[in-house]
Each structure stands twice: as C-alpha cells, then as structure tokens.
C-alpha cells in the first residue's frame, strides 16, 4: 500500500464507523434472515450434490476425504473452520510449501498473487467442481452457523494476514462471504492487491442493494464459467 492509498484509508475511517461499526439494525436483520433462508435451501441441495461428488471420485479413483476443512479469518479476526468440497490432491499443502521453500516458479507465483494459475494439484473432479463453483456449496453450512454470509469479503487465510497491511483492520469488521466483490470482478483473474482493495471498498460502502447486485452478478459469472474463485 503506497502513501497516498494509506492516507485515503485513514480518511475513510469515519465513513467506516458509520457504515460498518454502527451498522443499521435493519440491514443486519434482513441480511441475516436472507442468509438463514438461503443456507437452508443450499444445504438441502448439498445432499444430492455430495452423492454425485462421491460417485465421481469413485470412478476417477480420487481417494481421500470428500470435504476439505480449513481455518480462515472471520469477523473481528476470529478463526473459523470453512468447508469446501476437496478439489486438490490430499498432500496439496505439503506440495505448496515445498514449492515456496525451493523458490520454484509455482512458489514465486503463489507468494506474489496468493494463487496459482493452472494449479497442478487440482484433481480431475476438482476442475469440474471449481469450474461450476460447486466446490463452494458446503459453505452454506458456514452461512447457517453464522461464520459467513452470502455476500462479504473473501475468507482470507491466516498466512495472508502479513500481506494485507492496513486493509486487514477494515476487512475483518465484516463476515466473510460465500461470494463478494472479488468474485464478480473477474473472480480469480485479479491479483491480491486488487482483491484487498475491492473487499475494502465493499466493507466501507456495503448495502442491501449492493449485496443483491453482487448475488446476481455471481450467478451470471457461474453460468459464464469465468475464472474459478
């Protein structure tokens, strides 16, 4: 974050207090109500989808757990366990750490962008799940539990905090979302700094209208099969 950006972030603090810290009760009530209703329907759909994923894993000999559970940063910086369908090989984290330690091209790409294009760790079934965004369906459980919301900032990893700079203190004022501004602005096709900026702007300016627009754009992005989250 350069000097000008830092000053702008500081100047926006009063706006943050109005729109985030002291959120209107109606916004919180409506948003949580929609979260609960949508997550119940999502969990109902999760049952047949899970059966299909199990069958696909069996026929592609993709051994290992069907779900992937990972700690993410939630509201107020609290950690929570986020659920997804497993889309990578079982030892994906070990492979990534090895690339980072050995400073390979893959490791360097991850350090810079916090993601890997054409990630070799993704399984055949995983590619399908990511392309269709079905890998995110288990997160409806997180939404129902209150760890996440339908719309919000990205659920960042603990190891990403050191690179979030001042943005961190603003982004964690809100629950992470199943979808959000990053997903509709090119999905995974934007770099880490841009994702932080988009999430920061969302937290500062969020509203029910903006949430609705993001949901509609997310549905459109899924059907267009734009870059996976």
Predicted ranges, named:
Residues 129-139:
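Short acidic-aromatic low-complexity motifs
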Residues 1-17, 65, 137-229:
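Hydrophobic structural segments characteristic of membrane proteins
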Residues 14-29, 117, 121, 156:
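Juxtamembrane loop-helix boundary motifs flanking transmembrane segments in multi-pass membrane proteins
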Residues 6-7, 67-120, 179-197:
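Short, glycine-rich, amphipathic interfacial segments at transmembrane boundaries or analogous
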Residues 22-94, 208, 213-229:
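A hydrophobic, helix-centered structural microdomain
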Residues 62-63, 120-122:
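Transmembrane helix boundary and interhelical loop/hinge segments in multi-pass membrane proteins
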């Amino acid at each position: 974050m350069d000097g000008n950006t830092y000053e702008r972030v500081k100047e926006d603090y009063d706006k943050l207090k109005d729109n985030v810290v002291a959120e209107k009760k109606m916004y919180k009530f409506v948003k949580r109500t929609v979260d609960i209703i949508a997550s119940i329907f999502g969990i109902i759909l999760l049952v047949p989808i899970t059966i299909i994923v199990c069958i696909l894993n069996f026929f592609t000999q993709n051994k290992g757990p069907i779900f992937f559970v990972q700690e993410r940063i939630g509201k107020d910086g609290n950690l929570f366990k986020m659920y997804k369908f497993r889309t990578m090989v079982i030892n994906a984290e070990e492979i990534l750490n090895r690339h980072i330690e050995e400073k390979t091209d893959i490791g360097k790409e991850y350090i810079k962008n916090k993601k890997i294009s054409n990630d070799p760790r993704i399984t055949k079934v995983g590619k399908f799940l990511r392309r269709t965004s079905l890998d995110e369906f288990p997160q409806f459980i997180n939404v129902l539990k209150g760890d996440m919301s339908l719309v919000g900032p990205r659920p960042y990893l603990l190891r990403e905090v050191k690179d979030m700079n001042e943005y961190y203190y603003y982004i964690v004022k809100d629950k992470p979302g199943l979808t959000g501004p990053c997903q509709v602005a090119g999905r995974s096709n934007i770099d880490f700094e841009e994702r932080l900026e988009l999430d920061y702007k969302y937290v500062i300016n969020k509203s029910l209208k903006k949430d609705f627009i993001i949901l509609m754009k997310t549905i459109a992005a899924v059907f267009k099969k734009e870059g996976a989250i």
